[in-house]
Amino acid sequence: MTPTGTPRVCEVSILPIALSCLFSSSAARTKGAKRLGTGPAPSDCIRDHHAVKATVSSPDGPRYGRPSFHFGPPTALFNKSLAILKHDLEHLENFTPTEEHMVPALQLVASATAFFEKEDQRRNELEKILPAFLGQGVKWRTPIAGGSAKPNGILLEGSFACLIFELKNEPGLEGDPFLQSLIVYDKIISHEVSFRSPPVHGPAAKLPLQYSGFITQSNFPVVLLTMAGNYLVVSTAVYTDAVYADKLLSIDLHLGSHGPANVLRLARVFMAIRNCTDTLSGYYRRLEPGSRPSVMYPSLTADPPEDQTKIPQLEYIAKVDRASGIPLSIVDEDDECHGIYLAKRTCSSTDDTPAEVVLVKFTSTYGQSAHRLLAEQDPPLAPALYSCNRVIGGLYMVVMEYLPDASPLHRFFPPSPVPYSLKADVIREALKKALELLHARDHVFGDLREPNVLYSHEGDRVFLVDFDWVGKHQESRYSPCLNPDANLGVKAWQVMEKVHDEANLQRLMTWLTGE
């Protein structure tokens, strides 16, 4: 309810649409998984520039930041084990290695810094050392996924990969081991009958496992460990609406003046990795075939983890279109990049989030105080803000009111107009008031554009949204990644000023009225 007593969210009208989107997305995800492994062998995908470009630029290519628009939400948002690994790697001082860790750590540094004439010789040396960190269950050069992939090393729980290890003799020779490990991961996901490694309890251990039976039950979290000479990289990956991967840590292994500290750090890194693979093993042991569409959506861990009770318990319904806020049945390339969802509070939630459908946004920065200021006006000038908490992945989880009857201004014009007219005077006065309130507290909104102004024909209401860029007058700066096509009249990294908001209000009204 609004402060004036009028309902804003019609749960009955939005849920059938959103649920339809959920099951359509799940079906699309299953079909997409079958396409993942249809490309060349992993080693062929990285053999030269053209192969790499074709692999990562394809519609089903992995999202890890190349090209620049091929990225998505952090993998830590989707699995607690991966989130804890990221947190642990950022807080290595919490680990206290024993002699059992330090001896192989020194051996690994010495081996990594040595030169080998052939890659096989380097691999043979590492096969003797890595089990001390990863356990004896690692399979070396074992064909998997029907023989379509043969990783240097793989740690399996049943048929599921907990860790994939790829190696190159030296950096720059024979391709990128990180990308190769991602293609191996693609092959594993897409393969209909997955390799199952005994022992598994009971006679089922000898039966082929239909991987498709789990495609709607898991987002298949995995650790990717890669080495090229003395360069080691720790990464993670998941499969939701696409394959997403993050490089968490890169280390140049060497001794020198800081040898003891470098060896200690490496031992701690592998302690964190082992903790993660152990918990992933437990996760995969508990999996059963079935359907759980929530695997496409975040499963969050608070930052720090001990603040977990602050995270609202939500049931995610659909990803939404960034430009319109409409639930998506098919997630296209543009919408793969963001983390904006519809959700509903679960019955077990103990926070103040209301029971109706809410909008959940993940962002690296957020102007929480500015949002609350406008949301608490009567009538409100922004959607109600229910919570704003840090989660592992370096993001804020922002939970706010969802306004299905309000649309961004550009939606009232062709090519897909909303069948209602706008009242320019109402919009002008509401935005002037919003800016006056913000500027009185030295806030600069910083992103006053058509998509960030919602208009509802019910009561002629106007709402500002997207407080990611809010900054302090003459102190904060615009993003260094500012898109010049945003038409904000400012430059990247320019100092933020109130006059910029005022100029953009004038520009917006000129666009709206043609005057």
Describe the predicted segments one by one.
Residues 457-515:
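C-lobe/activation-segment region of protein kinase-like
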Residues 154-164, 344-356, 459-461:
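Active-site beta-strand-loop-beta-strand hairpin of nuclease catalytic cores
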Residues 317-380:
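ATP-binding glycine-rich loop module of kinase domains
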Residues 2-128, 270, 275-278, 282, ...:
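Charged, often low-complexity linker/regulatory segments
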Residues 77-215:
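A short, conserved, highly charged catalytic patch centered on acidic carboxylates
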Residues 439-456, 464:
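Catalytic-loop of the protein kinase fold
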Residues 261-330:
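Juxta-kinase regulatory segment immediately upstream of eukaryotic protein kinase catalytic domains
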Residues 363, 372-428:
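Conserved structural core of kinase catalytic domains
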